[in-house]
Structure formats: C-alpha cells, structure tokens
A protein has these predicted regions:
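Active-site phosphate-binding strand-loop segment of PLP-dependent enzymes
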Residues: 185, 190-262
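N-terminal small-domain helix-loop-helix segment of the aminotransferase-like
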Residues: 43-144, 151, 331-335, 443-445
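Conserved core segment of the aminotransferase class I/II
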Residues: 96, 267-346, 353-357, 441
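Helix C-cap/helix->beta junction micro-motif
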Residues: 69-72, 180, 240-241, 401, ...
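PLP-dependent enzyme catalytic core of the Aspartate aminotransferase-like
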Residues: 36, 128, 386-388, 395-405, ...
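Conserved glycine-rich beta-strand-loop-beta hairpin in the small C-terminal domain of fold type I
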Residues: 329, 345-355, 367-381, 415
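Conserved PLP-anchoring active-site segment centered on the Schiff-base-forming lysine
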Residues: 155-177
Length: 445
C-alpha cells in the first residue's frame, strides 16, 4: 500500500467470493488512506478554555521533571505532597479491619450522600464539639475533601462571582473556583503575625461580586492555627457582608504545643451559612482511601435552593466509594492514635520541630514555627537570594540535590520568596534533606 502520492491497485475483475482476507484488509486500508488524503490531517484536539487559568503545581511540571530524573535512575526525595503512607505511617489496624470486614456489604451503590452509619458518626462528632443542631442530613460523604470542594463550588458559583481565598492557600481552592466560573481573590495572611489572616485586607477586597470566604485552619501550607478571636473576626466579616463561609479543617487533629482548633461553625449562629470540610486522610493516615465529608451549618432555609445543588451533583456521581465509608464510624468513635504522633516524642511533632529548627539555621532563611499540619513554609530573604522565578528555583534544587519541594507561588503567594516542605520523613532523612537544601542555597548567595 502506498501513501497519498501513490496508488493502491487491486484486481477489479476479481470476484468478491475469491477476495482473500488479506485483500479485504488492504481494501479497507486503501479506503482509509484515500479519505485521509481528501480531508487532510486530523484537526488538533485542545483542552477546554475553562482550564486556561487552572493550576495545581503540587503535582505540576516540577513533579514531571522529578519523574524524568527517576527514569534516568536518580533517587528523588519527594517533599511536595502531604501523603503519610510512603514515609512509614500506617492506618490504624481497626480501620483496615473494618473495611475488610464490610467488603461483602460494599459491592453496591450507597445513598448518594453516604451510608447512614458514616453520616451519623460525623454528625455525632460535631455534636460532641458543641454543634448540637447538626443532623444526619447535614452531612455529605465524599471521595476526599477535594471532590466535595469542587462539587459545592460548582453548585454555588455563577460566572464572575468572587470568592476570597487566603494567600498562601491550598491551590485546589483557587483552581476549583476558577474551574467553576468564579474569580478567586486572594487576601494576605501576615507572616509577621504568625500567618494570621489580615482582616483589614479581607475587608478591602470585598466587592458587590464577593459571595464567599474560604478559611483554611489549621493552615496548609503555613501550619498556622487560628485563635478563637481570629475565627470570630473572620465570621463577623462574613456576617456583615452576607458571605458564605467555606471552612477547610482537614488538619484539625494535627496540633502541636497545646494549640487548640476552633471549629468555624461554632461561631456562625443563625445568620451565616458555613460549609465545613474534613475527613480521614491526614489524621488517620489513609489518603488513598478517599474518605472526606461536608457538614452544613447555619441558616439552611434561606439556602434551600443552593443546597439542592450539592444534592443534585451528589446524585450524579452516584455515591462515594462505599468501602472507605465503613472506616468513618470506626475512626471517629475509636482510639485516637493521632495523639501518639502530635505530642513530644511523636513523629509528627518531632519532625516538625526539627525541620523548623534546621531551616532557621540556614543563612538567609526564616520560618514561622508551625502550630499544626504537616508542613513548613520558609522564606528566602530577597536581600540574600536574588530569586526572580521560584518555580525555576525549585527545579534547579531538584536537579542539583534530588530534593522535590513546591514553590511558594504555587500556593498563590504574592512574591517568589517561599517554598513549602513536607515534614513527613523520619528525622535522619529530614536532616539530610534540609542539609542538601542548605548546601544548594550556599551556591545561590
């Protein structure tokens, strides 16, 4: 068979009954080639314009470069994702056993909002924390918090609506708002004040298009844990401007040095709608199980039309994965093994403190002490390090020292002078990793 410039010749006098299978295939190929020659090459297939401004740099181009280096045979220490399992953290045995035990009952769809026992366990958890009006129907189970965030924003946003998002943020929020047609407006968190939200900056950025306020507490990437006064101040802004509050609390159980987590929902009263997101991934070390939840509190009657949206979208996705739902009741009602990790002597605690100390020992590097979560977010003094492109900086670090971190602008920070480091490796590995970072920075001064 020839290309477009040639001819394909088959004996036209041949009887169809005598055409061999091979010739039949050749005739089909000839027809396909002729069609291609007539129509030209296939048009490019491009991604939707909706993705034009969507980024998720935690798993973005830098991770692609890390995979390329691994394919060349290099060993990369990945400090870019808060995933406990690869660093030797195992799920509580009771959770795994309960999932295995219930597998025969988990083969079909569940209720679209989640199985009743899981939603009841979540509702009772919040009731025990002072949110006594929480009902089972106020709970949606999801395939992790990420799914629920995207689902709720799709139900809430019209094109051009604005949502206030902290800077730095967990970039899923910015990406999901953009993908849902909204506009993320980033308010500054104050590094000199322990990364607390700048309430005046929030007020200054509210417009007639502003519809909601995102709170991430404990904070990813900074490790800040907000005081009760700060939480009340954020809720009061939402109250004055009739904003819906989206409270991301996935790290609520990972707290250091007697830090206290204050549920945003305990302060909203009857006039602020609050959507709280949490789950099992971090505190129970089961990121891969994808078990998260949404809790709705505040004035539900005025929000009835909006709340039909998440219900519709939950129906369209059929249901959350059923096996992992069986872990929720066991996790929330059982022994809280997370407490072994967050106090002195525990791995989360010791690794966070060690990383913070070692980073601050590097000339030109400063890091606010994390009070929770699994990260450090150090600053590189611009007077010492002339970094114009922090993404290129972390790529250069990766290539030189085989350490993978995430650049600060990947968390929508305003200046190219920070990076995020995961504090999950054991102390020896973490010490070596930060030593390599220090060696690399010595070449940049």
């Amino acid at each position: 068979m020839a290309g477009c410039g040639g001819a394909i010749s088959l004996d036209g006098a041949m009887s169809p009954r005598k055409v061999s299978p091979r010739l039949s295939v050749e005739r089909l190929l000839a027809n396909a080639t002729a069609l291609l020659c007539e129509t030209g090459p296939m048009r490019p297939i491009v991604q939707s314009r909706k993705l034009q401004h969507v980024r998720y740099d935690v798993r973005g181009p830098i991770l692609v470069e890390a995979h390329r280096l691994e394919a060349e045979g290099h060993k990369i220490l990945k400090l870019n994702i808060g995933n406990p399992a690869p660093f030797g953290f195992e799920a509580p045995e009771a959770i795994v056993a309960d999932i295995v035990h219930n597998l025969p009952e988990a083969q079909g769809y569940s209720d679209s909002q989640g199985i009743y026992s899981a939603r009841t366990a979540v509702a009772q958890y919040y009731q025990s924390h002072g949110l006594t009006d929480t009902a089972v129907d106020d709970i949606f189970i999801g395939n992790g918090v990420s799914e629920l965030i995207s689902m709720v924003l799709q139900a809430f946003l019209d094109d051009g609506n604005e949502i206030l998002v902290p800077a730095p943020d967990y970039p899923l929020w910015t990406g999901a708002i953009t993908l849902s047609g909204g506009t993320p407006v980033h308010y500054r968190c104050d590094e000199e004040n322990g990364w607390d939200p700048d309430l005046a900056d929030i007020e200054a950025k509210i417009t007639e298009k502003t519809k909601g306020l995102v709170i991430i507490n404990p904070n990813n990437p900074t490790g800040a844990v907000y005081s009760e006064g700060t939480v009340k101040g954020l809720v009061e802004i939402a109250r004055r401007h009739e904003l819906v509050v989206f409270s991301d609390e996935i790290y609520e159980k990972i707290l250091f040095d007697n830090a206290v987590h204050h549920h945003t929902a305990t302060h909203v009263g009857a006039d602020v709608l609050c959507l709280t997101f949490s789950g099992l991934s971090k505190a129970y070390r089961v990121c891969g199980y994808r078990a998260g939840w949404l809790m709705i509190s505040g004035p539900k009657h005025p929000a009835a039309n909006f709340l039909e949206g998440p219900t519709l979208l939950a129906n369209m996705r059929m249901c959350p994965n059923v096996p992992a739902q069986h872990a929720i009741q066991t996790a929330l009602g059982g022994y809280q093994s997370i407490n072994e990790y967050i106090h002195p002597g525990g791995r989360f605690y010791e690794q966070s403190k060690t990383a913070w100390r070692l980073l601050n020992e590097i000339p030109g590097v400063s890091c606010v002490e994390p009070r929770g979560a699994l990260y450090c977010f150090p600053r590189l003094d611009p007077e010492v390090y002339d970094i114009k492109d922090d993404e290129q900086f972390v790529i250069d670090l990766l290539r030189a020292k085989k350490i993978l971190v995430t650049h600060g602008t990947g968390f929508n920070w305003f200046e190219p002078d920070h990076f995020r480091l995961v504090t999950l490796p054991d102390l020896d590995t973490l010490t070596e990793a930060i030593g390599r970072i220090g060696d690399f920075l010595a070449t940049q001064r």
